[in-house]
Amino acid sequence: MENKPVALRLAIILVPAVLGAASLGWVSSSPAGSASFYLATAVAFLVWLIAWLGFGDRRCFSPRAGSTAARELGVGVGLGVVLLGIFLLGALVTRNILVLAEPVAGLMDNMRVDALWATVLTLVLNGVGEELFFRDVARRALDSLASPAASLGLQVALYVLVTVAMGVPLLLVGSLCIGLFTALLARRYGNILGATALHLSWSTGMAFLLPLFF
């Protein structure tokens, strides 16, 4: 990334982020299980994928030297399960707060449709797509533009700001936690194996278990 002009590096970060946010806004406004919902999620995935195909590291799923894929995936899954448990405990409280519970219940309606397999597939694809963009493309671009600490903060802030488009307040807390821990894993290992495992274990767990609360 360092050999690319600063303006291009900024565009690599901002253009997909804006397009992705617009797609997520479309997802949020689409009726549960509708063709519009699945089309919007497909568009969001394509935004992340195209950004990675253009500027991503093809070795981003290779384990760090001296480490193994199993170890890094295990760390990611372990952290994802811990965060899942914390969020489910939080759901016991937030389900009684109408302003917080209603948007979550609307989002969870997508897990109550006949084509559940399609919803889960889009969830997984977009989880992987977000990691390809935020924890590979955007991370490396920001690392080339800012100090390590500033880059980490900007990575998390970017992820939270894009998630705002979903219009679900509790997702902002989720994006803050997931954004921080996945960014730390990506920095530690220099790839997105652990980050993707964390993201998918948390998001799929939330998708199947949160409807029990809302």
Regions found by a protein language model. Give the residues of each.
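Juxtamembrane helix-loop-helix connectors linking adjacent transmembrane helices
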Residues: 60-126
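Transmembrane helix-loop-helix hairpins at the membrane interface
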Residues: 20, 114-214
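Structural signal for membrane-spanning alpha-helices in multi-pass inner-membrane proteins
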Residues: 20-25, 48-56, 83, 87, ...
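Short helix-capping/hinge motifs at transmembrane helix termini and TM-loop junctions
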Residues: 24-31, 55-56, 94-99, 163-170, ...
